[in-house]
Amino acid sequence: MKNTFRAQCQCGQLAVSFTQAPVAQLVCHCRDCQTVSGLPYAKAAFFRAEEQCSEGEFLAVDMTGGSGKPKQYRRCRQCNDFVYATVDALTGLLGVAADKLLPPFEFKPMAHVWTCEKAPETEIPSGVFQFPKAPPFRPGKQ
């Protein structure tokens, strides 16, 4: 039996599930992620979009990413909790708020991205890959 990875909002109305493990896990320091999460950075797990099963109604927050391409953050219509995002620069992937993923998921970031917009008080552990903007690779591509 395959593991199922499920993320949901606080009230449980908005959820997304996947039957495959994430293809990448990143900590994003971009201003948009700071604004949407209300934190100095966002922990994101990227899953293949075609493997998703979503339920519930969401409110869309449309923005333009650093690539100049659109991205859409999706929040629960009832509790306003951010759960996942689509990013046109990462076609075919969904970025899921790692803190919304239920056990047995364990967040293990590959890298910190958009560190040029990092909050001054945020420290990045030594030995971790860091990129001032987007990583030079596309998550999920070999």
Annotated model-derived regions:
Residues 1-8, 13-142:
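A short Gly-Trp-Pro
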